[in-house]
Amino acid sequence: AVTAYRGHIYGITVKTFLPNYNEFYEKRWFSSARELSTDHIYASELLGSEECDYAIPLGNNLIYHLPDAFCFGAEICEDLWAPIPPSAFMAMSGAELILNLSASNDTIGKREYREKLVKEKSTSLMCTYLYASAGANESTTDLIFSGHCMICEGGKMLAENSRIAENNYLLVADIDIERIQADRLKGKTYQDCAGTYGSAVSMRQILIPVSEAFESDGSLRSVNPHPFTPGDTKRRQKRCMDIFHMQIGGLAKRLSICGGKMVIGVSGGMDSTLSLLWLHRP
């Protein structure tokens, strides 16, 4: 994954975990980032030109800083599927955005599994996870690709493409960076984990001098006017029953401690009516 801005390459992120099972046999041709013998490559070697030569950071431990905006890191395809992915150390070192450049083929049920992976990762790392996979034009006689792309923040899917992407397209969404930062400040367990394991991998911080402002009017982000009430009837009924049974459990525990019988004066108001329903419910 090459990170470039205005003709300058700021870093190259290398894949760490190579799949070598089922239809994949990447270790036949490629090596892991763990086997790198250098932490940089010169632009002249990469571009074949001596006109502008400089050292480009190379590895799986790069975090990019955009002044007064956000930090991001990148990982490649199979890295997401690992028990401890490179993105875990990137997030604990400050990256609010994780980008995944992937070539994940389609099989029965795999799309749904990828969705669960990305949602879970954006939840546990308290980040926004941007996932982009190879499109339909990359399909061969052996593998089918659909161009599956997702933008997920804190376990919530902000944007996702249709089933098969045959043409080039952009997937966009408004991301709440300040919410991510606030959640991390509030989440003491996250801070403890970062303090314990964040230094396990030495991350390299790279500044990208971007002058453009990253602002939005929020029109690309849908806001649910009823965040605690599911729109789907079945889910709403389940939510209400969950609340109802929690209240029953709390009242039953209190009565078991106090002993004796329950006496309710039913006035017709909400409190006494609900109390009567809680007691009547087996």
Regions found by a protein language model. Name each.
Residues A1-G265, T273-P282:
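Enzyme catalytic cores with a strong preference for nitrogen-chemistry domains
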Residues G269:
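Conserved G/P- and acidic residue-centered "switch" motifs that form tight phosphate/ATP-binding loops
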